[in-house]
């Protein structure tokens, strides 16, 4: 996409991630919008509105980060865990365009909160862990930072600043209906090779300050507007630049990897006595998938067949 407005843009970019670069500013980014996929993931749970909203934001953030992976089998996991927080655990992951996520929380304590609930009110003291698993390269990277700031986006920026030392801007938004969520990630490219100053060590670099100033003009309703094509959104933000290179959109889908064989393989790791202790009054070991809420009832005969 050049700096002129695209003549023919897609009607909407629901359930897609679009990567882009601004070569003259040494910046790269991703913009994501979720629609039906978000509904599909949330429909597996009966979450109250505040919990559904924070999970929606986390799913968008996971898509923004996961779509950076170049390895098809690579996996990105976002995990927020707290000490005595209303939200005990939030987990989302991305692999090959597929998203899933869930939240464990205290319903009674949530109901006691006032209507305005910031990040600290929901999580209290906790941490954000972001893990990149790259099986082809046999590598695993994990960064852990405190859950700080008033939003999940602020916590993500803290992760990039502290763990990767890459100047980054993250914005996340959920529309009033809760059925559409969007987000944008913009970073200053760490271009330096050995012997050169790496751009990401200069947090006050004028190129980054310029890009960040433009990106900060984005509105929440632009990110979550299903009628606004993502390329048009990028043009609105950066049309004064010499060039914006938009990449082919990456389709996103709900993907849960639970199945009978996987559950069976997990249970088979337990000894026979432990397996018998798990059997319920109906004669089954029932295993719930927290991601998609499916229940797998397995008898001992099926387990040991």
Where are each of the predicted segments found?
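Interaction interfaces in information-processing and related assembly proteins
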Residues: 2-247
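Cys/His-clustered metal-coordination modules, chiefly Zn-binding fingers
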Residues: 212-305
């Amino acid at each position: 996409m050049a700096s002129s407005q695209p003549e023919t843009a897609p009607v909407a970019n629901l359930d897609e991630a679009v990567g882009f670069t601004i070569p003259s500013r040494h910046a790269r980014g991703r913009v994501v919008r979720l629609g039906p996929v978000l509904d599909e993931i949330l429909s597996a749970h009966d979450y109250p509105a505040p919990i559904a909203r924070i999970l929606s934001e986390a799913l968008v953030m996971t898509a923004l980060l996961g779509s950076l992976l170049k390895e098809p089998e690579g996996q990105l996991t976002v995990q927020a865990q707290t000490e005595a927080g209303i939200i005990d655990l939030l987990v989302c992951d991305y692999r090959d365009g597929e998203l899933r996520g869930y939240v464990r929380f205290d319903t009674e304590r949530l109901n006691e909160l006032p209507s305005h609930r910031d990040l600290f009110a929901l999580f209290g003291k906790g941490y954000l862990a972001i893990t990149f698993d790259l099986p082809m390269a046999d590598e695993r990277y994990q960064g852990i930072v405190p859950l700080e700031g008033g939003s999940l986006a602020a916590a993500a920026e803290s992760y990039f600043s502290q763990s990767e030392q890459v100047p980054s801007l993250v914005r996340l938004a959920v529309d009033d209906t809760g059925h559409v969520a969007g987000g944008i990630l913009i970073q200053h490219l760490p271009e330096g090779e050995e012997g050169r100053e790496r751009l990401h060590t200069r947090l006050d670099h004028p190129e980054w300050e310029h890009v960040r100033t433009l990106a900060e003009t984005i509105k929440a309703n632009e990110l979550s507007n299903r009628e606004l094509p993502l390329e048009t959104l990028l043009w609105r933000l950066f049309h004064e630049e010499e060039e914006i290179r938009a990449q082919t959109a990456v389709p996103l889908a709900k993907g849960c990897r639970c199945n009978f064989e996987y559950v069976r393989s997990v249970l088979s790791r337990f000894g026979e006595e432990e397996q018998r202790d798990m059997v319920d009054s109906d004669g089954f070991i029932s295993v719930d998938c927290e991601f998609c809420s499916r229940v797998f009832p397995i008898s001992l005969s099926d387990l040991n067949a």
